[in-house]
């Protein structure tokens, strides 16, 4: 895979969808709602002060080896080694996937705030991790016996999102790190391309194994890398898993330890795959409970209230802060894909804002249970990383 961004391969399912969605089509009333571009971002723009706070969270844990939660298969006594020997590039931030997306956080913030005071330290941290020797060690670990499903799909998807962020940067250091990461990027992409056709059912939970969220991250990588095989595998997965879904039970969410919404993550993936008019029609059948209203009547998100966090020192209960952050960006992404005067926009944007308001003040690092990962979710939201046309 070269360094230059390639034109993404696309294949349309418009004809196919026209038949499957006709029963879900709803004539939109002739009422005027604000265009998505006229409504405020769910969290407001990411400013330098917030960027510095979030960068500090990643810098604190990127090479902090302990505590460490290993997802590690041992085949012999020789596999009982410390994390920095097992996965020498990504061994901090409690677990592999959090360390990977902590690297993504720093790469993105360097890209957005190249002159910020934290950038020097961030470059040093990234250079420490992303060396040819460390990446070779990561590949060797992945290829070890019993590790075919290691960090699949969540951590692997974040690895590709890190690769995409490096590919999209014109920074000289980022170009070098991209080249260094490329062998691991290829290894991960090949694993996922092989895995998706063998996955017969999507995983519809609210934690790491969820399929839809990972597919969205992988889709964005495929758009940057120009990987045609991956794009085809993702489009096939969208058709098999989600195209005919109806009436997603949003009222059953969240489960007590969710950090992803199964319903919203699916919609956030499908808005990437489908054309805007077809997505708007599909969404009517998939989430018919989204209110249709004017801006003045959509202020209270009673249809989707933010999740309640009872104990931020509990590593599982603290997931709900992440749920609120990811819901906010998914709602924003869904709104972004709808027509400018769609009457669902006010409700979607009001709910996105309410979730962001509930979660962002909690991204402080007071408790390592959330501090090792919530910064990434805050940056993904506030920098609008999942929206088309953003840097």
Predicted segments — roles?
Residues 2-11:
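Short, low-complexity intrinsically disordered segments enriched in A/P/G/S/L with frequent Arg
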Residues 14-25:
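Bacterial N-terminal signal peptides
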Residues 27-38:
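Signal peptide processing junction and immediate N-terminal pro/mature segment
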Residues 38-91:
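Low-complexity, Ser/Thr/Pro/Gly-enriched N-terminal "stalk/linker" regions
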Residues 42-48, 83-100, 140-156, 198-211, ...:
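Solvent-exposed loop and edge beta-strand segments that line ligand/cofactor-binding
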Residues 100, 109-225:
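Extended ligand-binding groove/face enriched in aromatic
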């Amino acid at each position: 895979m070269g360094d230059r961004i390639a034109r993404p391969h696309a294949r349309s399912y418009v004809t196919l969808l026209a038949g499957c969605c006709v029963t879900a089509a709803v004539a939109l009333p002739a009422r005027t709602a604000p265009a998505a571009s006229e409504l405020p971002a769910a969290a407001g723009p990411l400013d330098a002060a917030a960027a510095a706070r979030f960068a500090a969270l990643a810098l604190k844990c990127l090479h902090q080896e302990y505590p460490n939660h290993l997802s590690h298969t041992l085949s012999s006594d020789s596999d009982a080694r410390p994390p920095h020997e097992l996965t020498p590039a990504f061994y901090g931030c409690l677990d592999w996937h959090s360390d990977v997306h902590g690297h993504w956080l720093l790469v993105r913030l360097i890209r957005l705030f190249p002159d910020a005071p934290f950038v020097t330290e961030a470059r040093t941290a990234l250079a420490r991790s992303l060396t040819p020797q460390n990446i070779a060690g990561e590949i060797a670990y992945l290829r070890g016996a019993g590790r075919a499903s290691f960090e699949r799909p969540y951590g692997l998807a974040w690895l590709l999102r890190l690769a995409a962020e490096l590919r999209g940067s014109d920074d000289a250091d980022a170009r070098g790190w991209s080249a260094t990461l490329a062998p691991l990027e290829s290894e991960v992409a090949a694993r996922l391309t092989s895995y998706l056709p063998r996955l017969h059912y999507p995983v519809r939970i609210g934690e790491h194994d969820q399929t839809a969220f990972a597919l969205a991250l992988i889709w964005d990588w495929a758009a940057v890398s120009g990987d045609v095989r991956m794009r085809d595998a993702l489009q096939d997965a969208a058709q098999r898993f989600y195209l005919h879904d109806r009436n997603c039970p949003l009222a059953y969410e969240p489960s007590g330890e969710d950090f992803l919404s199964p319903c919203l993550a699916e919609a956030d993936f499908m808005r990437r795959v489908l054309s805007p008019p077809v997505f708007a029609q599909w969404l009517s059948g998939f989430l018919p409970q989204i209110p249709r209203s004017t801006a003045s009547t959509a202020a209270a998100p009673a249809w989707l209230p933010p999740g309640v966090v009872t104990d931020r020192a509990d590593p599982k209960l603290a997931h709900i802060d992440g749920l609120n952050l990811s819901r906010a960006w998914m709602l924003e992404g869904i709104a972004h894909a709808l027509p400018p005067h769609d009457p669902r926009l006010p409700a979607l944007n009001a709910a996105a804002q309410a979730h962001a308001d509930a979660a962002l003040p909690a991204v402080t690092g007071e408790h390592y249970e959330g501090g090792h990962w919530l910064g990434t979710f805050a940056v993904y939201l506030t920098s609008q990383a999942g929206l088309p046309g953003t840097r």
